[in-house]
Curated annotation (Swiss-Prot):
Phylogenetic placement of the source organism: Archaea, Methanobacteriati, Methanobacteriota, Stenosarchaea group, Methanomicrobia
Regions of compositional bias (Low complexity) in chain numbering: 16-35
GO molecular function: DNA binding
Keywords from the UniProt entry: DNA-binding
Gene3D superfamilies according to UniProt: PDCD5-like
Protein family (similarity comment): Belongs to the PDCD5 family.
Family matches, as InterPro entries: DNA_bind_arc, PDCD5-like, PDCD5-like_sf
Protein name: DNA-binding protein Mbur_0117
Region entry Disordered, spans: 14-37
Keyword check for rRNA-binding: no
Keyword Chloroplast: no
PANTHER family: PROGRAMMED CELL DEATH PROTEIN 5 (PTHR10840:SF0)
Chain segments annotated as transmembrane: none
GO cellular component: cytosol
Length: 114
């Protein structure tokens, strides 16, 4: 009888764990979402310190079409700011230069007619 009772207790514990598992998944997803939002706010705060309003506006507009490029640039700017390598604020002109340096060079193809 003890074995049967032990099996029942084990099965009951498994069922209770399965029922609480969706709650744990939802809670973990919520925590990840909160952590991501906090990181985004920290990045925005750093960018406010190192960029002029015009440059931030350009970056915001560019995010709509080139999200990966903007995220890469933001991470580099945050890293430079944290290391103290930015002496002046990034203005719109400096941002344009940085963006052109980050974009891969396109091949020029020319068609010649014979």
């Amino acid at each position: 009888m003890d074995d049967l009772e032990a099996i029942r207790q084990k099965r009951l514990a498994e069922l209770q764990q399965q029922q609480s598992s969706p709650q744990n998944d939802a809670q973990a997803a919520y925590q990840q979402e909160q952590a991501q939002a906090e990181r985004d706010e920290q990045v925005k705060a750093v960018l406010r310190q190192v960029m002029t309003p015009e440059a931030r506006e350009r970056l915001t507009r560019l995010r709509l079409s080139r999200k990966e490029l903007v995220e890469q640039l933001e991470s580099q700017l945050v890293m430079l700011a944290q290391n103290g390598r930015l002496q002046t604020k990034i203005d719109d002109e400096k941002l344009k230069v940085l963006l052109t340096q980050m974009q891969p060079q396109k091949r020029q193809t020319s068609i010649t007619r014979m």
